[in-house]
């Protein structure tokens, strides 16, 4: 990973659990969003997954390269939580990001099922996306 800010941001957003638990959608979750795992293993998995997401975004979305670290952290967090296919459903938000209209991108991010399912996270992240 290029720096620890994004890693630390995802760690704060996901939280660490050494044993599996049932999340709000009924999914068994562990580690940093991964059932029994050491913290070191979870951190290795997290770093690898975040690097993969970052590399994919750099290779496939020109606008992502020009985002500051805070905005990249939000995008990586969304892809990490929702998967790439889930993130790509945010067509209007992505279009606003391409235009560097971060206010509109945040509005579109909040107008979603994701924001209804994880409202505190969505509000926090869309504020960060808007502010940069």
Please annotate each region the language model reported.
Residues 64-91:
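Mid-chain, well-packed structural core segment of small domains
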Residues 1-19, 25, 34-37, 41-58, ...:
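Long, amphipathic alpha-helical surface segments
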């Amino acid at each position: 990973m290029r720096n620890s800010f994004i890693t630390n941001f995802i760690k704060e957003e996901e939280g660490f659990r050494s044993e599996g638990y049932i999340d709000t959608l009924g999914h068994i979750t562990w580690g940093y969003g991964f059932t029994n795992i050491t913290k070191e293993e979870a951190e290795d998995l997290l770093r690898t997954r975040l690097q993969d997401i970052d590399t994919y975004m750099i290779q496939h979305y020109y606008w992502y390269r020009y985002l500051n670290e805070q905005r990249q952290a939000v995008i990586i967090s969304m892809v990490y939580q929702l998967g790439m296919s889930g993130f790509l459903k945010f067509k209007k938000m992505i279009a606003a990001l391409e235009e560097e209209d971060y206010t509109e991108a945040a509005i579109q991010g909040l107008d979603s099922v994701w924001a209804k399912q994880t409202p505190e996270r969505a509000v926090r992240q869309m504020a960060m996306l808007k502010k940069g």
